Amino acid sequence: MNKDVSQHTPMMQQYLQLKAQHPDILLFYRMGDFYELFYEDAKKAAVLLDISLTKRGASAGEPIPMAGVPYHAVEGYLAKLVALGESVAICEQIGEVGASKGPVERKVVRIVTPGTVSDEALLPERQDNLVAAICEQKGVFAIATLDMTSGRFLISELANKTALMAELQRVMPAEILYPEDFAYIPMLNNYKGLRRRPCWEFELVTAIQLLNRQFGTQCLDGFGVQQAKVALCAAGCVLHYAQETQRTALPHINSIHLSQDSEMVLLDAATRRNLELTQNLAGGTEATLASVLDKCVTPMGSRLLKRWIHQPIRQLDILKSRQDMIATLQQYEQIEPLQPLLRNVGDMERILARIALRSARPRDLTRLRTALAQLPLIAKCTQNLGACLAVLLSKNADFSELYTLLEQAIIETPPQLIRDGGVIAEGYHAELDEWRTLSAGATQYLDNLEIRERESTGIDTLKIGFNAVQGYYIQISQAQAHKAPIHYVRRQTLKNAERYIIPELKTYEDKVLKAKGAALALEKQLYEQLFDLIMPHLGALQQTAMALSELDVLVNLAERAESLHYVRPSFSLQRGINIKAGRHPVVEHVMVEPFIANTVFLNSQRHLLIVTGPNMGGKSTYMRQTALICLMAYIGSFVPAESAEIGVIDRIFTRIGASDDLASGRSTFMVEMTEMANILHQATAQSVVLIDEIGRGTSTYDGLALACACAEWLANKTQSLTLFATHYFELTSLPSQLKGVANVHLDACEYNDTIAFMHSVQEGAASKSYGLAVAALAGVPKQVIALAKQRLVHLEEFSQQTKMAQQHPQADLLFTVEMPEEEKMAPLAKAESAVELALRAITPDELTPRQALDELYRLKKLLSSS
């Protein structure tokens, strides 16, 4: 692109000047009915949007690459770009064509970015859409997140980069802002929407001034965030970015909240992944905890429930209050009456954000009107449901005047866009009604004029029409065109007709178009005034939306508890978990056969269980269900069990499954050890820890030694509430050596080389692992199973002979066994020949003489070929 803009046409000079202000993002440049892109933007958009790349003449002697999208379809293209992590500057024509010399005046009116979009078509309906800013100062990491669609503004400070990554994994922002001098950029490689920002945007003084100006305060003490200085730096950056992209006031962003670890049950990234809270291991949303629990009838309720799932809390008073409300809703049978009313509330939270940004569409206002109409009905349903629900719904103000305003101002079913007109209701504004009457009278006038002209000219094919290009016209068929009077001025010739204009029709056309234009301009003005009239109610409306979303979640959890037979858990201030007949909430939901419930009991005297049993026996399910039941209790939900008493929990850790990290060059074993190291460093006596088969990725003795050492550390040092699944039967001796350790196993029965899994947890260690039986079930060839059994006998007979293993620790255990000499010389497994396989497949009694002869020839041929 030529930097000397003077060599370009005036229009391209204007484009280049605007593009220079937004060099790193796509510029949608409005030209008539299209948004055009030029140069590198055009090439990039052509690839991303699968649109044609063309050329627009030449400027400065070079052809200009160009691509474009129709203005009326722009939302679909923006949605695709946002999903790809791209940002777009929208440049509109703000001047009148021909109003001044040179190109029509244009300016960038908004910037659409993945983290700050508010348009309904560009947003995931039931997921939060966040922009985050991160920074680090003197070893303190911080993150600030802003939800532009609700005004929710949160900050937190973190002890290390691992905690920061866990927080990013939790909130999954659509955009991440970081300072130019950020030293940890490589750890962000897996995220889209990365934006490097100048360091001055992270300065503390600048941030505090910006935040005070936004909130209309003199200091931030009232928000309790004044001590979180690093987090405030991040908050300043994210607020500046929001103002820069929206280019309008942000009245719905009116507070900021500091999240503290002491209020939460902490979950690291591995735990969220392994427990499949909102995303399964394959990356989908099926068979997750959220897929079972989330039957909310409003999108804002669904988003709130997912936030609860990802951030369980430790404040017992809030948890018990939620439980009380769920129990009350069940007791008074108000679930079924409330859900249809809440469904009509819709996504009030995001509608209010669009109103605050003055980007709400007419149908947003009708949805708000519908939501307000539900409030008296919801209040009536809940008026006798106890103090807790009364406190929740006390946030609802009286919006009867606002409802009346919207009822009078907006028609019942308005068009999608204000530019289409016909949004403001008749009777709302006298002048608008006058302009509309003048415009509407055109139909009768034109009918009368058509009849009069037919009679005066004698042309029976004469008719009056209108189109956007030609305006009003008189049309006469070609066969009768010669009869047109002399004062008819030809406007257009068609194949079968001629079109004319007369002075009277032209005068009326000007009058009607003026009336339509005046009506539309006044309607847009009145529509903007509606935003001004709603704005004083915005804070109260936001509080009401929050209350309704919480009510939706609680009604939903009450319905889930009732439908799925969940019980109310109790909380204890003592350390421990006592779950009677617990069930995995997801597995039982997808199973056809009945789920086998199991009990888990952990306390200060019994805090580590060695879990043994066969593969597929249910060890992982048992462990995960324990963690999920604890998590469900700590969001205020009822749980799948006969009874559950949950003690104080500060964190939940999991080390389950095997996966490598090729992008970072880490093997499966390295990933496993990294996760284990995090647990050993961070776990406390109040943590719940799930360990599944640690030590598999290295030599047998190394793995056994690591597993034993980790179990001892968890038993003696951290004394966490731990479920430790293993196939190393040597670990089952730990209860006799360590305090607080016990054995449990998943039961199974073996009969005639087949295995039946009981999925029942029993006290004591398993008798064997049944690995060969499971391999047979998986379809491993019988010859391989037979060979494995043979080798297993020798391994068991000579397992005490470890001399070679001690001399060569990494040697395969199979070759540490002294086998009889004749078996050393024997082939591992003689494969059956083609002839033998063919013979085995023949059933002689079923063959006719002719078939038998054919088979004999086939066998002889096979023998010759082999």
From Swiss-Prot:
SUPFAM superfamilies for this protein: DNA repair protein MutS, domain I, DNA repair protein MutS, domain II, DNA repair protein MutS, domain III, P-loop containing nucleoside triphosphate hydrolases
Annotated protein name in UniProt: DNA mismatch repair protein MutS
Protein keywords: ATP-binding, DNA damage, DNA repair, DNA-binding, Nucleotide-binding
A Pfam family it matches: MutS_I
An MF annotation (GO) of this entry: mismatched DNA binding
Keyword Membrane tagged: no
Function: This protein is involved in the repair of mismatches in DNA. It is possible that it carries out the mismatch recognition step. This protein has a weak ATPase activity.
Family: Belongs to the DNA mismatch repair MutS family.
GO biological process: mismatch repair
Residues annotated as binding ATP: G613, P614, N615, M616, G617, G618, K619, S620
Matching InterPro entries: DNA_mismatch_repair_MutS, DNA_mismatch_repair_MutS-lik_N, DNA_mismatch_repair_MutS/MSH, DNA_mismatch_repair_MutS_C, DNA_mismatch_repair_MutS_clamp, DNA_mismatch_repair_MutS_core, DNA_mismatch_repair_MutS_N, DNA_mismatch_repair_MutS_sf
PROSITE patterns linked to this entry: DNA_MISMATCH_REPAIR_2
PANTHER family to which the protein is assigned, alphabetical: DNA MISMATCH REPAIR PROTEIN MSH1, MITOCHONDRIAL (PTHR11361:SF34), DNA MISMATCH REPAIR PROTEIN MUTS FAMILY MEMBER (PTHR11361)
